[in-house]
Amino acid sequence: MDRFVVNPPWPELPRVTALLNGFPRDYHVHDYRTTLSLKAVVAGAARYATPGGRYLVTPDVFLVLNHGQRYSMEVDAESGTETLCPFFAPGFVEAAAWSAAAGDARQLDDVDARGAPFELVERLHPAVGPIAAILASMRAAVRARRAGAAWIEDRFHDLALALAALRDDTRREMETFPAVRRATREELYRRLYRARDFLVSCYAEPLTVAEAARVAALSPFHFHRAFRRAFGRTPMQLLQHHRLEVARRLLARGDEVTAVALAVGFDSLGSFSWLFRRKHGVAPSELRPGRKKQD
């Protein structure tokens, strides 16, 4: 019988459909083999690593890990992170995806169908749309202590259908990638998103095109060309854009300009200030609360 629970004991996790919500401090997971699961945070950040990628999960993105994937995860005590992670019992999302695709007549004839194995491309997704709304409602109910078993079960049904729709969206996006053969497009999609997630997750490090190309398992020139065709900007343009967006958020909360420049990967304060002004139209210090025009 399917069980739907909130914050179950860790050993039960592989056998139930569950929502984990909490405020871990100096929390580390090493080489855990997961069921199909979704990784999100309400506040702060969590770092995930799998054999194929590195991911920084923040409130504006979420990560889906497929059944059987091994991952490690860490949360720093000082980050004030609140995690929100649904785990799905084996077969649950498969059945939902099959039901969404099959007609009523077929389902009447085959009530026990479980569907084909469900798998999504391992990548960061923007925390928008139905999935973000469902997660927000689940978190609000848990915090308010009104997340009964029946209510949680309904939300997991909604979430499973939303994941099936996300897989359909991903397949449509794959069709837009620059390659003739379908298999090539799918593989290029996986590799380019792996590198893209690496760039936006490791932005504080001194990254290069060659390093990102190695993550994608492509030659630097092939990677650079394919990345620009797929995402409309070069790898370094995307990295710079992301660094400046993170910097804007850090400055708005009151962090020092020099500390922010270093935190987002700039080794020159002058270069950071010039690029920031060019992108946002104001000097970095003008975004800090109570500080105006001091750069």
Where are these regions (language model features)?
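Short helix-to-turn junction characteristic of helix-turn-helix DNA-binding domains
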Residues: L199-C202, A247-G254
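An amphipathic alpha-helical interaction segment
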Residues: D112-D197
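N-terminal regulatory/effector-sensing and dimerization cores
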Residues: D2-D112, R143-A150
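Flexible coil/turn residues that form the inter-helical turn or adjacent wing/linker of helix-turn-helix
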Residues: R145, E205, R253-D255, G265
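Hydrophobic recognition helices of helix-based DNA-binding modules
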Residues: A96, L159-R167, F227, L251
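Basic/polar phosphate-binding segments, predominantly the helix-turn-helix DNA-binding elements
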Residues: D168-D169, E175-Y189, R194-H242, A261-G290
